[in-house]
């Protein structure tokens, strides 16, 4: 430890009595827990050890006090750490925020929190995502990692403490992660325990920390194709959840707090975490300022919550402007600053003006007044006369030029600056650009452009160091105008002729120079300073600081701007003083250099920041014999920072013994606009020092000054920054709204009126008026005088004795829920939480982002490379608690990023606005993140209370009274359609095939294509009939099957499947088509096959030889029981034998086939299709699409269920048209296949699935030109129909249409079908009738189960498209699912359907009896005299009568599908459709490939697939949380980031969210990161 005297060795510790060792261990534990401060720890520890240790050799009490402070990053230090660098805190403190008082306050607040501490769930992270920042990649601010022996001592201590039966800190072991060496997700993530009971549990945990876990990786459910390295998604698979089919419906209780997670044992890691999260969320929240927004009908009251009635209010009288002392008239003050230079340069040429230091801190060059004058003259002459031609000079007086000089070259800068003044051109000093894309560089470019700068002055050395292109030219910096670079070294300058003299006029309001200033948003503005203001500033400073000729000033500040420029470049020339400039680079290698310079030169004045005080304290033991007795002023220029007081105190206490006088410390406040706002005058020796203000943080947050009387932890101690400048006037105005004068006890923005401030923002008239021309008004609104004031951007008040106090900056103001917090205060609180080994102290940023109608606080810090996950998480949790305790404000997001990755300002600070921008655009790349939306977001609308519904009869009467029709619609009436088709006389499809085999034996019905687009198989009517006969014969002979037996057909998409289907019909068996298992992913796909075989009670399986081998393979045995398959018959080589007689069903109501499908909620359902339904279905499709023998259609979708199956296997046989079959998986090998086929055969009607459409849109998006060169033209397409059982994906359809419009695709061609389990084809666009219509509906209304139509572009609007036309013979009605009464036109309800091709019932629903028969035949509760039997589709939608004319000549009724009822999420009393939330999430970051949401115990879980690098995983967490909150008013509970392809998608392209949910809860996703939002 630093300054612990002699550290006992491990051996010595071992020799101590056991009770002392135990007490030591307990102390260590208390310190690590934050129960005692570092000071208290040291005290108790030395007391314990004193009887056992030899007398310590040095007792440096002051050193003890500053023990925790170590200097900032240095390359040199790392090589030779001196002993005082070894410090327990392991961190250089950013001394701006150093305050022992505050640190103790924070520790006390945390201790209070600890009594009620909750176990927060720690995020789960895949090993590869841990921050691996190479040690050499970052410059650690110190070298103080604790020594090895100390580490081992700590471990012993922890163990022995655990053995103590007095376990006060049981919760310290909670959440300790067992970090294994295995890379599997289980090992790398965290095991969370509940509260530990008793010692044994605790010990187990301690030892768990030292154990290595080896857990085998869980089976990979997701990698389905060996070709998954391609950009395509792995082969789509139907996955019912966790091996058995679950029905999870609204009826079953899904919200019990700790249900068994659907077959997942509750003690799974994920559920433990979620339980912890729920416990955390159950804590009472601080009541929001106004309980909630009220949800008036629809509208949220979109505003900040109302102010708290009990908040403190200002009570003082209105302040009066405060005047500074008059500016003295000194007869020999020059009429302009340039005149002063001329005077000293010609009369006192040998006097030193400026000394520059080399890297080691030694003086390297002294510029005399004579040299400054002569070189400035040469430069002025060169600029005006030598850059262009005589007739066309490049520069004229009044032009702006950029000054680009490094911070270690004050001499060249000074010559350039004064050269410009003498030439009457306007210098604009900027930082040296380091790379083409510096942080904030683009904004500097904007400034240069707006100032019209075409010329940059620089030194030869600097020019050589600028980044160059390959051919040696200076790179074009991002956003910069083209610049001509001029080198100002003496050898390149021309000597002016004897008769040439610069034009020096008395100072007026013409611009002298422009100083850049970065605003809170990151924009850079140029503050223009006039020659008069420059002169007046020098006069005011000279008077306030009592400057006299020949004094020496040590300047540690940036000499290019602010106080460093005014004191070190202007006031020194005015008063013929000598400035010694100490650059930042010297301070980094030798922190004491400025103190040494003061000592060596007997300097009277030093210009520093708190940082410099701190660094000097760190290094002061290097040099005992320095004296600061010569200093009459130590000007602390960031005295305006509220945290400067403790730096000044600490520095004084350390250096008073070195001659520093207490009255020499002079804090001042400055701003770019108002220049010096106030400065403490040098005091009289022995006079009492000014008092401090101890203010209540809570009062400050309401903008009032209250002496702190409450909890001392939440006090802010501020020192004054002296009095108003000579000749100036100051007032305090309200920070927002009109510039109204504040009351005396109110905090406001400091405004200054004087000639010494800036005059405008260059080229920005609008902003200038609001800042530089402010006329304050009284409370009644009348102006106070006519003198304009300048806003300083500083917040503060004028205290007793006209002393000025500053409590913050406008730029650092965070307005949260109507209260103001200062970013610096929050940084200070964060750093006061002992960061042990977690973060770098100087690298922390606090800003606010606007989310959901309020500002939210974000804290970002750089994490040390050696910080463990555990330490980081502990630190983060405690920072949250500390800020909550002290500032009474929640932190929305706390992020840690790898060392050295935050954007830097030129002097090494953090570029806040750039950091905020990176955060908002998702490119900050955090390595740890903690979001707390649950605590911060208190302005959500109240959850909806369901009102007692109006009865169905009243609804109907209400609709009639209002003149609204009931929401119903119908396709054409089948009875009226005259058909002279021979097909009508056949009732069964098998008969139609036989008839076709006789009537048109050679007519080809089917063509199957392969990936190359060549025909691999065709089937004419006769061929298909013969093949079916042979299969029927095999079923009888080999299978010994009887009529009515169920047969599973397991075939790849093709003609074999069709033949097997008709073979079953010929044999009287009931076919069940099933997607074959995927050879590369049997574990995921085979159980589904097995389940269908079991559920359908199949007597036999028909398949190919290849698949038969697969079903019986060893790999299959690992997934299912292969011994109990029913008979498996392969149909590759069939005997030439046929049945003596083909089966004919006795009635058309007999079962034709079973249609099995896994729904998106993971439920396997089989529906029964009768022969009459099959006939009616085929007839409706034939009529709608005008299908007959001479037509050809192309089909590219999966043939296993629903309408896809009907189109693939049934329709061609019924209508006689030719179907060109394209198996969708062939597209993975050849993306062009489908479109090329359509083009080759000039097909007019084609059917596909969303998967196919998405594949083509994504895969061919940038290949349209290739399609053109291949001669592909899609103008032949009349209808391109997507077969779906969901809400139409309008954006995908539009992308597809837009993309292929260039190759002839008609924008009217693309449409969609709609079907459900009860009726596979309800809507299909067809060839006639109006185009599908679209409407925009309000999302907020939809959540309330209402439809409100809005205009395009309305906020929160959703575009819905009609799902094609209702098929002939189909009637739909929209029904309230609860009352079962019909609803009115344009009202939301469940879609009920009546049609001859509705399925006749569920075959069996495995594991869910909630879907009873009433799904298929139910009646309206009211208003249907005909007592029609309806089938419930389970989908929400609405019918809207349009102005268009239908084929029947009546007005067209459009059906809009909103989504499946059993997929909806009920959250906060509202109904959400997952797809709406997913759409928002997918838009939020370019690296989100796919996304799915589900709920678990009322928490919203969002799973996103990351298609970028794993570094980006944590960027997604805040973006996802923000967008769901903004657009859906929901707080995300858990964000899971996974690899591409993890979200399971079925053959129809639908996400299987319930399967994903089960995998998540069973911890099978191997996530990259799981974030639990607090």
Curated annotation (Swiss-Prot):
UniProt biased composition (Basic and acidic residues): 91-103
Phosphothreonine: modified positions: 70, 139
Presence of the UniProt keyword Hydrolase in the record: no
Extent of Low complexity compositional bias: 69-82, 154-166, 181-192
Organ and tissue specificity: Highly expressed in brain and spinal cord (at protein level). In brain, expression is detected in the main olfactory bulb, cortex, lateral ventricle, cornu ammonis 1, cornu ammonis 3, dentate gyrus, striatum, cerebellar cortex and medial habenula. Expressed primarily in neurons including excitatory pyramidal neurons and inhibitory interneurons.
Comp. bias regions, Polar residues: 52-62
Mutant lacking the gene: phenotype: Excessive axonal outgrowth and branching with decreased dendritic outgrowth. Reduced acetylation of alpha-tubulin.
All residue ranges annotated as the DMAP1-binding domain in the record: 12-130
Modification Phosphoserine, positions: 9, 50, 53, 99, 145, 147, 152, 177, 192, 202, 256
Example of a GO cellular component annotation carried by this entry: dendrite
One MF term in the entry's GO annotations: alpha-tubulin binding
Swiss-Prot/TrEMBL GO biological process terms: negative regulation of axon extension; nervous system development; positive regulation of peptidyl-lysine acetylation
Region (Disordered): 31-166, 178-200, 217-244
SUPFAM superfamilies in UniProt: Acetyl-CoA synthetase-like
Location of this chain's protein in the cell: Cell projection, Dendrite; Cell projection, Axon; Perikaryon
Pfam families listed in its UniProt record: AMP-binding, AMP-dom_DIP2-like, DMAP_binding
PANTHER family the UniProt entry points to: DISCO-INTERACTING PROTEIN 2 DIP2 -RELATED, DISCO-INTERACTING PROTEIN 2 HOMOLOG B
Role description: Negatively regulates axonal outgrowth and is essential for normal synaptic transmission. Not required for regulation of axon polarity. Promotes acetylation of alpha-tubulin.
Recorded family membership: Belongs to the DIP2 family.
Subunit structure: Interacts with alpha-tubulin.
The protein's name: Disco-interacting protein 2 homolog B
Origin species: Mus musculus
Lineage, broadest ranks: Eukaryota, Metazoa, Chordata, Craniata, Vertebrata
Gene from which this protein is expressed: Dip2b
């Amino acid at each position: 430890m630093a300054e612990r005297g002699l550290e006992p060795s491990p051996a010595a510790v071992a020799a101590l009595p056991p009770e002392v060792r135990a007490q030591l261990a307990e102390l260590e534990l208390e310190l690590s827990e934050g129960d005692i401060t570092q000071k208290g720890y040291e005290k108790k520890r030395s007391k314990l050890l004193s009887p056992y240790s030899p007398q310590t050799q040095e007792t440096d009490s002051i050193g003890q006090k500053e023990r925790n402070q170590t200097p900032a990053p240095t390359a040199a230090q790392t090589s030779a750490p001196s002993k005082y660098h070894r410090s327990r805190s392991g961190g250089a403190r950013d001394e701006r925020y150093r305050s022992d008082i505050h640190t103790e306050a924070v520790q006390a607040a945390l201790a209070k929190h600890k009594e009620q501490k909750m176990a927060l769930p720690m995020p789960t992270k895949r090993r590869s995502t841990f921050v691996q920042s190479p040690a050499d990649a970052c410059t650690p601010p110190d070298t103080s990692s604790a020594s090895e022996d100390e580490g081992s001592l700590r471990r012993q201590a922890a163990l022995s403490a655990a053995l103590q039966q007095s376990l006060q800190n049981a919760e310290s072991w909670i959440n300790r992660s067992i970090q294994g060496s295995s890379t599997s997700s289980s090992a790398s993530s965290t095991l969370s325990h509940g509260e530990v009971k008793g010692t044994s549990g605790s010990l187990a945990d301690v030892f768990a920390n030292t154990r290595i876990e080896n857990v085998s990786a869980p089976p990979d459910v997701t990698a389905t194709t060996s070709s998954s390295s391609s950009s395509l998604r792995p082969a789509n698979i139907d996955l019912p959840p966790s091996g058995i089919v679950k029905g999870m419906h609204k009826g079953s209780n899904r919200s019990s707090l700790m249900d068994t997670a659907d077959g997942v044992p509750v003690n799974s890691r994920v559920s433990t975490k979620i339980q912890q999260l729920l416990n955390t969320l159950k804590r009472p929240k601080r009541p929001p300022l106004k309980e909630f927004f009220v949800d008036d009908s629809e509208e949220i009251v979109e505003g900040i919550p109302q102010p708290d009635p009990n908040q403190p209010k200002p009570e003082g009288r209105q302040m009066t402007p405060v005047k500074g002392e008059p500016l003295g008239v000194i007869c020999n003050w020059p009429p302009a600053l340039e005149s002063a230079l001329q005077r000293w340069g010609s009369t006192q040429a040998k006097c030193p003006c400026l000394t520059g230091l080399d890297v080691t801190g030694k003086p390297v060059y002294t510029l005399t007044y004579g040299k400054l004058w002569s070189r400035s003259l040469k430069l002025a002459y060169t600029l005006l006369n030598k850059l262009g031609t005589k007739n066309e000079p490049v520069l004229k007086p009044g032009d702006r030029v950029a000054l680009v000089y490094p911070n270690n070259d004050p001499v060249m800068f000074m010559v350039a600056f004064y050269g410009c003044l003498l030439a009457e051109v306007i210098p604009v000093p900027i930082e040296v650009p380091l790379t083409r894309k510096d942080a904030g560089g683009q904004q500097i470019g904007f400034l240069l452009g707006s100032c019209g700068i075409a010329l940059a002055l620089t030194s030869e050395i600097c020019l050589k160091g600028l980044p160059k292109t390959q051919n040696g030219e200076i790179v074009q910096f991002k956003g910069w105008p083209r610049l001509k670079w001029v080198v100002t070294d003496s050898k390149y300058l021309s000597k002016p002729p004897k008769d040439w003299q610069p034009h020096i006029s008395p100072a007026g309001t013409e611009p002298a120079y422009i100083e850049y200033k970065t605003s809170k948003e990151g924009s850079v503005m140029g503050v223009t300073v006039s020659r008069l203001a420059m002169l007046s500033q020098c006069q005011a400073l000279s008077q306030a600081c009592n400057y006299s000729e020949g004094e020496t000033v040590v300047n540690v500040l940036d000499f290019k701007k602010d106080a460093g420029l005014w004191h070190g470049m202007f006031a020194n020339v005015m008063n013929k003083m000598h400035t010694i400039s100490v650059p930042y680079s010297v301070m980094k290698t030798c922190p004491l250099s400025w103190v040494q310079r003061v000592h060596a030169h007997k300097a009277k004045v030093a210009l520093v920041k708190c940082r410099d005080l701190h660094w000097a304290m760190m290094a002061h033991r290097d040099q005992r014999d320095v004296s600061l007795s010569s200093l009459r002023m130590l000007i602390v220029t960031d005295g305006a920072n509220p945290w400067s007081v403790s730096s000044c105190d600490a520095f004084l206490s350390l250096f008073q013994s070195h001659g520093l006088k207490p009255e020499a410390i002079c804090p001042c406040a400055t701003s770019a606009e108002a220049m010096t706002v106030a400065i403490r005058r040098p005091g009289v020796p022995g006079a009492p020092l000014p008092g401090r203000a101890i203010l209540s943080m809570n009062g400050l947050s309401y903008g009032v000054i209250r002496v702190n009387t409450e909890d001392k932890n939440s006090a802010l101690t501020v020192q004054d920054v002296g009095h108003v400048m000579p000749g100036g006037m100051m007032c305090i105005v309200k920070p927002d709204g009109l510039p109204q004068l504040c009351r005396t006890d109110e905090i406001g923005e400091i405004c200054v009126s004087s000639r010494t401030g800036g005059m405008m923002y260059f080229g920005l008239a609008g902003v200038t008026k609001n800042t530089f021309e402010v006329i304050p008004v009284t409370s009644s609104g009348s102006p106070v005088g006519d003198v304009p004031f300048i806003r300083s951007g500083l917040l503060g008040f004028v205290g007793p004795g006209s002393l000025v106090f500053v409590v913050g900056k406008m730029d650092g103001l965070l307005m949260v829920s109507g209260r103001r917090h200062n970013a610096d205060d929050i940084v200070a609180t964060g750093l006061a939480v002992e960061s042990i080994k977690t973060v770098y102290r100087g690298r922390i940023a606090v800003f606010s982002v606007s989310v959901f109608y309020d500002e939210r606080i974000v804290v970002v810090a750089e994490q040390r490379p050696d910080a463990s996950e555990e330490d980081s998480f502990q630190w983060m949790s405690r920072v949250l608690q500390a800020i909550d305790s002290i500032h009474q404000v929640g932190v929305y997001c706390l992020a840690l990023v790898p060392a050295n990755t935050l954007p830097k300002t030129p002097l090494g600070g953090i570029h806040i606005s750039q950091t905020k921008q990176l955060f908002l655009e998702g490119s900050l790349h955090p390595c740890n993140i903690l979001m707390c939306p649950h605590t911060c977001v208190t302005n959500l609308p109240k959850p909806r209370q369901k009102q007692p519904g109006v009865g169905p009869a009243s609804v109907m009467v209400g609709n009639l009274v209002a003149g609204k029709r009931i929401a119903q619609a119908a396709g054409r009436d089948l009875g009226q359609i005259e058909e002279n088709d021979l097909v009508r006389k056949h009732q069964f499809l098998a008969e139609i095939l036989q008839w076709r085999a006789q009537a048109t034996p050679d007519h080809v019905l089917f063509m199957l294509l392969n990936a190359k687009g060549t025909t691999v198989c065709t089937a004419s009517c006769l061929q298909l009939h013969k093949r079916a006969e042979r299969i029927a014969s095999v079923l009888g002979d080999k299978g010994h099957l009887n009529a009515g037996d169920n047969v599973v057909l397991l075939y790849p998409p093709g003609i074999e499947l069709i033949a097997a289907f008709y073979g079953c019909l010929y044999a009287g068996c009931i076919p069940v088509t099933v997607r074959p298992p995927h050879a590369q992913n049997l574990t995921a796909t085979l159980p589904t096959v097995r389940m269908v075989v079991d559920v359908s009670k199949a007597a036999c399986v028909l398949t190919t030889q290849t698949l038969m081998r697969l079903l019986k393979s060893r790999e299959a045995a690992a997934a299912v029981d292969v011994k109990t398959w029913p008979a498996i018959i392969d149909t590759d080589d069939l005997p030439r034998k046929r049945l003596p007689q083909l089966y004919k069903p006795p009635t058309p109501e007999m079962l034709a086939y079973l249609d099995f499908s896994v729904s998106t909620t993971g439920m396997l359902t089989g529906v029964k299709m009768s022969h009459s339904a099959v006939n009616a279905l085929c007839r409706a499709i034939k009529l709608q699409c005008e299908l007959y023998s001479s037509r050809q259609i192309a089909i590219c979708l999966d043939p296993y269920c629903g309408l896809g199956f009907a189109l693939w296997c049934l329709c061609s046989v019924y209508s006689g048209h030719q179907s060109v079959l394209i198996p969708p998986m062939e597209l993975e090998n050849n993306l062009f296949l489908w479109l090329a086929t359509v083009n080759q055969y000039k097909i007019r009607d084609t059917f596909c699935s969303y998967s196919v459409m998405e594949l083509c849109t994504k895969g061919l998006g940038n290949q349209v030109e290739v399609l053109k060169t291949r001669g592909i033209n899609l103008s032949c397409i009349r209808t391109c129909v997507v077969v779906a059982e969901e809400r139409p994906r309008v954006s995908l359809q539009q992308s597809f249409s837009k993309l292929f419009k260039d190759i002839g695709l008609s924008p009217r061609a693309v449409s969609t079908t709609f079907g459900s389990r009860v009726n596979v084809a309800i809507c299909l666009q067809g060839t006639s009738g109006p185009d599908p219509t679209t409407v925009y509906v309000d999302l907020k209304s939809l959540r309330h189960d209402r439809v409100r139509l809005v205009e395009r572009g309305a906020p929160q609007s959703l575009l819905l498209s009609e799902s094609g036309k209702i098929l002939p013979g189909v009637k739909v009605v929209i029904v309230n699912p609860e009352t079962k009464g019909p609803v009115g036109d344009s009202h939301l309800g469940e879609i009920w359907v009546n049609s001859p091709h509705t399925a006749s019932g569920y075959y069996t629903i495995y594991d869910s009896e909630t879907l009873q028969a009433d799904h298929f035949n139910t009646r309206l509760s009211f208003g249907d005299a005909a007592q029609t039997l309806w089938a419930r589709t389970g989908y929400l939608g609405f019918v809207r009568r349009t102005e268009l004319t239908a084929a029947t000549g009546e007005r067209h009724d459009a059906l809009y599908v909103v989504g499946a009822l059993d997929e909806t999420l009920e959250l906060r009393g509202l109904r959400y459709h997952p797809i709406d939330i997913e759409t928002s999430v997918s838009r939020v970051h370019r690296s989100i490939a796919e996304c799915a949401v589900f709920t678990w115990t009322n928490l919203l879980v969002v799973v996103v697939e990351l298609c970028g690098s794993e570094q980006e995983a944590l960027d997604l967490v805040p973006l996802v949380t923000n967008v769901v909150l903004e657009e859906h008013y929901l707080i995300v509970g858990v964000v899971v980031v996974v690899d591409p392809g993890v979200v399971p998608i079925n053959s129809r392209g639908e996400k299987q969210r319930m399967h994903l949910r089960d995998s998540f809860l069973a911890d099978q996703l191997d996530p990259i990161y799981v974030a639990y939002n607090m």
